Amino acid sequence: MRIYSCHFCSSPVYPGHGIMFVRNDAKEFRFCRSKCHKAFKQRRNPRKLKWTKAFRKAAGKELAVDSTLTFAQRRNVPVRYNRELVETTLKAMTRIEEIRQKRERAFYKNRMKGNTEKDFLRDKKLVESNPELLKMREVELQRQAERAAAGVDEDAEMGDSDEEMEDASEEESEEEEQQQQKIVLKNKKRSAKKIAF
């Protein structure tokens, strides 16, 4: 049983699967699925499509240059059957596969090494710009403390009469915000009911 590789995306083509196109110079092109066959007919470049092995190797996302990959090359030279040779090749195949998997894992770890710092910095920047993403109650308390501190500064300048007016206006604004939130929630519920079948 021979498992071919797709001419377009390099994924395995198992017996009884896929499509084979034979050109008039007798060159065979095997495809794993109609997606690859259509892309080939449209003369698309596999190196420009992110889901192909060719792109991943060209972009440095997968191990491309390695001695273990040379064993997978197809050889059309007939060899006389030898029982010992078959045994050694079968043992070598399993060993080569283990080595290749180890090297691929090491390559992936090496490629992902600097990502933790980048992710941390990106998340930190996001939290600094949007503190609401953290616990809502803590953010609200901080804002109230800031308002109170700002109110104390203004009181020193304007006096006690202004303080009462500010408190009243703050209470009114908070009530308005709560009413707006209730209205928005009600609207969402109504729209959800309309959409449901």
UniProtKB/Swiss-Prot annotation:
Biased composition (Acidic residues): 152-178
Basic residues bias locations: 185-197
Pfam family, one: Ribosomal_L24e
Domain of life: Eukaryota
InterPro entries: L24e/L24_sf, Ribosomal_eL24, Ribosomal_eL24-rel_N, Ribosomal_eL24_CS, TRASH_dom
Keyword Cytoplasm carried by entry: yes
Keyword terms of this UniProt record: Cytoplasm, Nucleus, Ribosome biogenesis
Molecular function in Gene Ontology: ATPase activator activity; ATPase binding; structural constituent of ribosome
Keyword Nucleus: yes
Subcellular location: Cytoplasm; Nucleus
GO process annotations (BP): assembly of large subunit precursor of preribosome; ribosomal large subunit biogenesis
Disordered: annotated span: 144-197
Gene Ontology, cellular component aspect: cytoplasm; nucleolus; preribosome, large subunit precursor
General function of this protein: Involved in the biogenesis of the 60S ribosomal subunit. Ensures the docking of NOG1 to pre-60S particles. Activates and recruits ATPase AFG2 to cytoplasmic pre-60S ribosomal particles.
Family: Belongs to the eukaryotic ribosomal protein eL24 family.
Subunit field text: Associated with nucleolar and cytoplasmic pre-60S particles. At the end of biogenesis it dissociates from cytoplasmic pre-60S particles and is likely to be exchanged for its ribosomal homolog, RPL24.
Protein name: Ribosome biogenesis protein RLP24
Organism of origin: Eremothecium gossypii (strain ATCC 10895 / CBS 109.51 / FGSC 9923 / NRRL Y-1056)
Gene symbol of the encoding locus: RLP24
